[in-house]
Design a protein with these regions (language model features):
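Sec-dependent signal peptide cleavage junction
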Residues: 21-38, 44
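Functionally critical loop-and-helix segments that line ligand-binding/catalytic clefts
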Residues: 44-70, 87-90, 96-98, 106-197, ...
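Structural recognition of the beta-strand scaffold that forms the well-ordered cores
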Residues: 193-196, 215-220, 225, 246-251, ...
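Solvent-exposed loop/turn segments at secondary-structure junctions
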Residues: 199-203, 216, 222-227, 247, ...
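Catalytic domains of cell-wall/extracellular-matrix polysaccharide-remodeling enzymes
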Residues: 279-361
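Substrate-binding cleft of extracellular glycoside hydrolase catalytic domains
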Residues: 179-311, 321
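Trp/Gly-enriched beta-strand/coil motifs that build multi-repeat beta-propeller-like domains
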Residues: 397-528
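Bacterial Sec-dependent N-terminal signal peptides
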Residues: 1-13, 29
Length: 528
């Protein structure tokens, strides 16, 4: 509703972060809108150069195989890092020696969950069966023997792939940046490059990271329940807010049942509030990280129905706390095993797959994320960082038009450009959400600018546009397109005191503003 006070300010319940888009990570040189055939070969190799290397872990192309696997490691154990395996009973063993690991930093205690990234020194690792690792080690030994005569006994590692025929890669689709698998099958369009980070990355220089092409971040808030938050979560959140980097949150689960996940959910809500993160601050979801965890005296669930209850309880806690934008994160083999449940699939929006293609195809939403490498390199970050591509499978025909409000001048601004809206919000403008939806093609709506008072105006009438230009307004081209026959009327209001125009679908707002002095100028156009 438009407030009578000053006849200018439009009431808003949205914050800056109400401008919502689905976005996602790549090396800086790959974060360019480039054609598929022009994708740098080195980037294709970054994604997949080690996938077929003779000394790489299955499903983890950047993790090195052990030289040998102890006979004490059973085939049904799970390898959780380059040097650790977990038995079905939950005991952690050294892969090469078979000795049981008791370091509380790695396995926790009966009452204390360990940092899940401690086992891998902060890097992501997709758990794989010990049987597969044994097969890979055996194959690696055979390849080394076959190649040793021509390589003077040196350790052999296959060269990087030449071009992008073999690796997942960035390109363009429908004139938007997109991410493809190694066969050029589209994973997502309108795609963004996103990193996920934790305290293991230390103090990140977020300004450098943003300048290097980072378009979003998923920040670890914590793990389990009753633990401290991630030591760098507050700093990472503050920096993303300061620099206008869209961000989301992830929380690693140690839940054995719905009771545990409910506690985890309550912990997430508590820490989000503690760190000043409102639902409107989150451009990406709060992700529930479900993996095969290791915790002394405890074992992760294996029944999908149990996990379904875990997910529902966590969702309930977050939703009760006011956080609705949620998602599940996991890796393909776990989704095809303990998480194989239709309800969980419907909530899965981010998947780790360190290979040439995404093998999980049951995304329940149009938006999706592919964490495609754990060894990305970004300026401002020491060491490796996970990279993901976030986007949508199908391109929406609806173009959101963002409404911004300047509290100092009392003027409103409308734009189809999300980056422009974000830039204005960083300069102090209030984001009043999406005013209406335009179309991708149709009748042009022209945008003109008054350099004397900073006012913008938007009109479908080319004669009105030309007349204003003749008076000194600047022609800024086409702002967006609208259909001949749309779903709803968009009304035009004029403030005779400020010269401001407001465009709204809300008939109640239109009539209310008219009752307090705004000029009701009828239907401007229809929304898509």
């Amino acid at each position: 509703m438009i407030s009578p006070k000053s006849l200018m300010k439009i009431a808003t319940t949205a914050s800056v972060a109400a401008i919502t888009v689905y976005v996602a990570v790549v090396p800086a040189y790959a974060m360019q809108d480039i054609a598929i055939e022009d994708t740098p070969s080195s980037f294709a190799a970054t994604v997949d150069d080690a996938q077929n290397s003779s000394n790489s872990m299955p499903d983890n192309p950047n993790a090195t195989l052990p030289e040998t696997v102890s006979e004490n490691i059973s085939d049904d154990s799970t390898v959780v890092s380059e040097n650790l395996a977990v038995t079905p009973e939950g005991d952690v063993q050294n892969i090469e020696t078979g000795e049981t690991v008791t370091d509380a930093q790695l396995v926790g205690t009966q009452s204390q969950q360990p940092d899940p990234l401690a086992k891998t020194d902060g890097e992501s690792f997709i758990p794989v069966s010990a049987s597969d690792v044994k097969d890979a080690v055996e194959q690696s030994v055979k390849q080394s023997v076959e190649q040793s005569s021509s390589k003077n006994g040196a350790t052999v590692k296959l060269a990087k792939f030449d071009g992008n025929d073999y690796g997942a890669h960035w390109g363009t689709y429908n004139n938007t940046k997109a991410f493809f698998d190694y066969r050029n099958n589209l994973f997502a369009q309108q795609a963004k490059g996103v990193i996920d980070v934790s305290s293991w990355q230390g103090d990140i220089d977020w300004a450098k990271a943003k300048a290097d092409g980072v378009e979003g971040a998923i920040i670890r808030l914590g793990f389990g329940w009753g633990n401290d938050a991630d030591a760098k979560a507050q700093r990472n959140i503050n920096e993303c807010k300061r620099l206008g980097i869209p961000f989301g949150i992830y929380w690693y689960s140690y839940a054995e049942d719905a009771s545990g996940s409910r506690q985890e959910g309550n912990d997430v809500v508590s820490k989000l509030r503690q760190f000043g993160v409102s639902p409107n601050d989150l451009r990406y979801p709060v992700y529930y990280d479900l993996e095969s965890w290791t915790w002394t005296g405890h074992t992760p669930p294996t029944n999908p129905n149990v996990y379904n209850g875990i997910v529902n309880a966590w969702y309930g806690a977050l939703q009760s706390g006011g956080y609705q934008n949620l998602g599940v994160y996991s890796y393909t083999s776990y989704l095809q095993g303990p998480l194989n449940n239709a309800n969980i699939y419907a909530k899965t929006r981010w998947v780790a797959q360190y290979g040439p293609q995404m093998e999980f195809t049951a995304f329940g939403t149009n938006d999706r994320g592919w964490q495609y490498t754990s060894s990305g390199q970004i300026n401002g970050i020491s060491g490796s960082v996970d990279m993901s591509a976030f986007g949508v499978k199908e391109l929406s025909q609806n173009v959101p038009i963002y409404r911004m409000y300047n509290r100092n001048s009392g003027l409103h601004h409308y734009t189809a450009n999300y980056d422009e809206a974000l830039d204005l919000s960083l300069k102090g403008w209030l984001a009043e959400g999406i005013s209406f939806f335009a179309a991708r093609e149709g009748n042009p709506v022209y945008r003109v600018y008054n350099p004397h008072d900073g006012n913008h105006h938007y009109t479908k009438d080319s004669e009105e546009k030309n007349y204003l230009v003749s008076l000194g307004w600047r022609d800024e081209g086409i702002g967006w397109f609208v259909p001949d026959k749309g779903k709803a009327n968009v009304y035009r209001l004029y403030n005779p005191y400020s010269g401001d125009h407001v465009f709204t679908e809300d008939l109640e707002e239109y009539n209310s503003a008219g009752s307090v002095g705004w000029h009701k100028e009828g239907i401007a156009w229809q929304s898509n």
